[in-house]
Amino acid sequence: MHVSSLKVVLFGVCCLSLAACQTPAPVKNTASRSAASVPANEQISQLASLVAASKYLRVQCERSDLPDDGTILKTAVNVAVQKGWDTGRYQSLPQLSENLYQGLLKDGTPKATQCSSFNRTMTPFLDAMRTVR
């Protein structure tokens, strides 16, 4: 497996882990459990990955149905709030997501592979964006 392919797989796993967390659990107090189980730096990293992949889909994969960067960021913060995460530390989210996006542009993985992977793994987040608009 090429290093660039490994990056796409790891990025997809990160997206899937966050997407899986969007499904409500039948346990009371899920938000506080979720907030306690994911360190703040990991929260920001997961959200930045979602934002970067969404921007990649919109720009590189020509997904004109996806919103602008501001709406994507707003959706990411809304997801964090729904999870009970403390969004007060998210000032670095725009810059970190842009850094990840630039890294995706430099990645040697074929664009078609990245587009296909992101389209599959990002569905829950993309659906959440449609409600924010």
UniProtKB/Swiss-Prot annotation:
Q: Which cysteines are joined by disulfide bonds?
A: 61-115
The GO biological-process annotations, alphabetized, read as: intracellular protein transport; protein processing
Its keywords, alphabetically, are: Cell outer membrane, Disulfide bond, Lipoprotein, Membrane, Palmitate, Protein transport, Signal, Transport
Lipid moiety-binding residues (S-diacylglycerol cysteine): 21
- Alphabetical list of Gene3D superfamilies matching this protein: Chaperone lipoprotein PulS/OutS
Q: Which residues form a coiled coil?
A: none
Q: Where is the lipid attached (N-palmitoyl cysteine)?
A: 21
Q: Where is the signal peptide?
A: 1-20
What does the record note on quaternary structure? Interacts with secretin OutD.
Q: Which NCBIfam families match?
A: PulS_OutS
Name of the featured protein:
Pilotin OutS
Gene behind the chain: outS
